[in-house]
Curated annotation (Swiss-Prot):
Family per similarity comment: Belongs to the group II decarboxylase family. MfnA subfamily.
UniProt cross-references to InterPro entries, sorted A to Z: GrpII_AminoAcid_Decarb, MfnA, PyrdxlP-dep_de-COase, PyrdxlP-dep_Trfase, PyrdxlP-dep_Trfase_major, PyrdxlP-dep_Trfase_small
PANTHER family in alphabetical order: PTHR42735, SPHINGOSINE-1-PHOSPHATE LYASE 1
Presence of keyword Ligase: no
NCBIfam families the UniProt entry points to: tyr_de_CO2_Arch
Gene3D superfamilies named among the record's database cross-references: Aspartate Aminotransferase, domain 1 (3.90.1150.10), Type I PLP-dependent aspartate aminotransferase-like (Major domain) (3.40.640.10)
Class of enzymatic activity (EC top level): lyase
Example GO molecular function: tyrosine decarboxylase activity
One GO BP: methanofuran biosynthetic process
Alphabetized HAMAP family for the sequence: MfnA_decarbox
EC number of the protein: 4.1.1.11, 4.1.1.25
Coiled-coil positions: none
Protein name: Probable L-tyrosine/L-aspartate decarboxylase
Amino acid sequence: MILQRDSDYSDGTVLGSMCTEPHPVAAEAFVAGLHVNLGDPYLFPNAYRAERECIGWLAETLLDHPAPEEAEGSIVSGGTEANILAAYAAREVTGGREIIVPATRHFSFEKAARMLRMKLVEAPLRSDYTVDVDAVQDLISRDTALIVGIVGTTETGSVDDIEALSDVAEDHGVPLHVDAAFGGFTAPFLREEYPLPRFGFDLEAVVSVTVDPHKMGLVPPPAGGIVFRDDEFPKAIEVYAPYLSGGGASQYTITGTRPGAPVLALYANILELGEEGYRRIAFRCYEETLKVAEKARELGLELAVDPPHLNLVNIRLPDRGTAERLLRESEREGWKISVSTKPLGVRIVMMPHLDAETVSRFLELVARVLGG
């Protein structure tokens, strides 16, 4: 079989991925929806209705929308497409050409800027790798189309102060987009017990949020999500396809044909897990993360963000040579790891397929490499 030599989440060796083994219910629903094209809603009205319900659930349960029935959005190919759509809509609504992004932004914003002929204006970071909000305020210009904040940066899992960013954005009349591709399914629950900021539509300046079901939503890829506060921004990028079944339909996603399988998988998970199920998963992963962080400290390893904001631990590495040596030793022992560049470190993403006991064995390898 062609996949025999590919990675398998179930053996606990995949340490750097933000995807994980799908929930069995989601996998079953995904297969059942293989034939569904959401780009043709007349042919698949119930799948389209399921997508509407998923967007409403995300808006209400995760994103604190005061009127979730007004939310618009789509399940798209991933966080990259979602972020591009957010930038595209902001450009069309505001007429601006600049996007203020943290230095920790996802590479999808580079793609968005190139595709949309926009300019990224980079804001510096604080010591915990969150964006410097005062610096963001100083960077706002008449050409600012969008400010971006992140809930769960790719390299350190840091959570920007979205509440403070919203205040700045509101004061200057600039839209705020939140990239919660990683943290969107966990931060709303962890905030109940840990000091994390609000980041949803209860903040006035937030106009759009990226949240990825194929990460902590336990849905098979491709399943990103873009949720807009209302229809103002998506209507600015809407296109009508007149030749579709039933007399045509409007859409604002980049792709015309869209797989329905990820939507049905998310819908199934919402029914199976619901708010309480996702809450349990979030806390279990974060509690395992804290155990890993404690083990790292015991071994004398330095965490880039301590304590971790979300279920991601980044262990600092002293130089590129050490990083390359760790990559070689990890591969030799069967670990699949990811090295970050800002800061230089090894990322351990505590997804549901991992536990602290397994990861502790890898930490001992890190300690040996750094000590040798």
